[in-house]
């Protein structure tokens, strides 16, 4: 069944909002105040239109999916404490892809990222996800360690990807939510097999 409602925040002081284009400035402010993700991936702070682009950017032509969710985790004053971009049923039913997951720098080190991600994962599983998928820029050590600690395994790499001022290598990672073997995932998403040279 396609996801029709936002995930619920597992942190009681935060509430979730869908970040549509009318909230682009709110997302842009969050990006500007929390540049660490962008510095680690593209080598430069978020661009002036990054918030709107995060919300409106489209997938490559021909890629199947059900919905792109851009979710904000809002403080009581309305400002954002975290955000996640999740694409449901990407390239195959039951594959949910995390495009972006950022937690405010001031919340690092206290377990909030783990709690928020686990809530997102529960939401995905309750809406039919059997596999979670994402890409990590090699050298972004904090992200690499975080996703490995959440049970993700590396499946393939893509090199020569331009992100801002940098040419980077992206490591695709996958996590089974229902105990499936990785061979079953490759049947659903053959482009993620290690020898595949296709775009992600």
Named regions from a protein language model:
Residues 2-108, 117-119, 123, 160, ...:
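Acetyl-CoA-dependent GNAT
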Residues 68, 168-172:
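Short hydrophobic/aromatic beta-strand or adjacent loop that forms the aromatic wall/cage
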Residues 124-135:
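Conserved GNAT acetyl-CoA-binding A-motif
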Residues 134-144, 161-166:
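Conserved beta-strand-loop-alpha-helix junction that forms the acyl-donor binding cleft
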Residues 148-158:
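Conserved acetyl-CoA-binding loop of GNAT-fold acetyltransferases
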């Amino acid at each position: 069944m396609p996801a029709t409602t936002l995930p619920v925040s597992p942190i009681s002081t935060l509430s979730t909002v869908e970040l549509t284009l009318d909230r682009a400035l709110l997302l842009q402010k969050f990006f500007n105040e929390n540049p660490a993700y962008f510095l680690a991936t593209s080598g430069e702070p978020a661009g002036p239109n990054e918030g709107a682009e995060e919300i409106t950017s489209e997938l490559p032509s021909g890629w199947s999916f059900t919905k792109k969710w851009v979710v904000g985790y809002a403080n009581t004053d309305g400002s954002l404490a975290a955000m996640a971009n999740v694409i449901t049923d990407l390239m195959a039913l039951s594959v949910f892809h995390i495009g972006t997951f950022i937690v405010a720098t001031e919340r690092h080190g206290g377990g909030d990222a783990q709690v928020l991600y686990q809530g997102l994962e529960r939401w995905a599983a309750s809406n039919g996800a059997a596999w979670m998928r994402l890409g990590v820029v090699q050298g972004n050590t904090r992200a690499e360690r975080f996703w490995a600690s959440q049970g993700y395994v590396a499946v393939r790499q893509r090199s020569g990807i331009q992100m801002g001022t940098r040419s980077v290598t992206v490591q695709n990672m996958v996590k089974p939510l229902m105990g499936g073997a990785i061979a079953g995932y490759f049947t659903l998403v053959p482009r993620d097999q290690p020898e595949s040279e296709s775009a992600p």
